[in-house]
Regions:
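Extended alpha-helical targeting/anchoring segments
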Residues: 1-299
């Protein structure tokens, strides 16, 4: 099928799940009390093709009468259209309400953590690592409002909104971690970003700067090598190849430097084996992966 999904699970897998899988001991309390993993299987999917302006209904093992199911879908679409027409869909209007953002690092502590990470690189423990921080946001806006704003103001190829009642997940990312079609596995790591220019000349200059950046190419090369190693653990011998290297991808607000690694999944392996081998992705950890994760947890 050319549809993005016809069956299967939807959900999220947290970084902490990957940390525990790699036996990296937690050295700090959790910032948020939430499950490490939630995957849900759904009977039905409504799929919207934005380019073709078509809707598809996919039903799996549905015992309900088909006509009744179609009526339910038509009613849902009609109600949604009415809300949209009346301006009642969340996130469709500009919201300039104030927000408060609180990081879990002070500026000085974060700078020190980055310096400590640089010291580990100089000492040869790691080649590259991803030092992030946790931001707590206080706002009157709902998570769905935030998702809609992200889709409108900074559209990304991959994103989602998951509502689990007391817990909502909002995601937006330009990066494809893993894809598998007909047994072929692909990962497309990103390392290297430049903002879009305000003019055509500025745009071309920023793109050229990224194309010629040895620093960004070196970072991406390290992650490509890591991803090749991860895929080789579950793919057929000799099948793992770098199919694309140092490509520039253009988005609404930025340029990204991207590569792609592909392999054919071994006959005795499945998607769970693939996730076990590759998660978390190298672009959000560093290389070597295990040591980078240990240092991230320390700092």
């Amino acid at each position: 099928s050319d549809l993005p999904i016809v069956s299967g699970a939807m959900g999220y897998i947290s970084y902490d799940y990957g940390r525990e899988k790699e036996n990296v001991a937690a050295r700090h309390p959790k910032e948020v009390d939430m499950p490490d993993l939630i995957l849900c299987f759904y009977d039905n999917f409504i799929i919207e093709d934005h380019q073709e302006k078509r809707f598809y209904l996919v039903a799996n093992g549905q015992t309900k009468e088909v006509d009744t199911l179609l009526d339910d879908v038509e009613n849902t679409v009609a109600e949604t259209y009415t809300l949209w027409k009346n301006g009642q869909i969340p996130g469709t209007k500009d919201d300039h309400s104030k927000i408060r953002v609180t990081p879990n690092f002070t500026k000085e502590d974060y700078k020190q953590a980055v310096q400590d990470m640089i010291d580990y690189i100089v000492e040869g423990d790691i080649y590259i690592a991803n030092m992030t921080q946790h931001l707590t946001v206080e706002s009157t806006r709902t998570p769905y409002d935030v998702f809609c704003s992200l889709r409108r103001d900074n559209p990304s190829p991959f994103g989602g909104y998951l509502n689990y009642g007391d817990l909502q997940i909002v995601s937006a990312s330009p990066e494809r971690f893993l894809q598998m079609r007909d047994g072929v596995v692909a990962t497309r790591p990103i390392k290297g970003t430049r903002k879009r220019g305000a003019t055509r000349e500025e745009d071309a200059a920023m793109r050229k700067e990224l194309e010629e950046s040895d620093k960004d190419k070196s970072e991406l090369l390290m992650i490509v090598d890591l991803e090749r190693n991860d895929l080789n653990r579950v793919c057929m011998p000799g099948s793992v190849k770098v199919t694309e290297m140092y490509s520039i991808e253009t988005y609404a607000t930025v340029f990204h430097l991207v590569s792609e690694v592909q392999g054919r999944l071994a006959e005795d392996k499945n998607v769970v084996d693939l996730l076990e081998a590759a998660f978390p992705g190298g672009s959000i950890t560093g290389a070597p992966k295990l040591r980078a994760m240990e240092i991230i947890e320390e700092l």
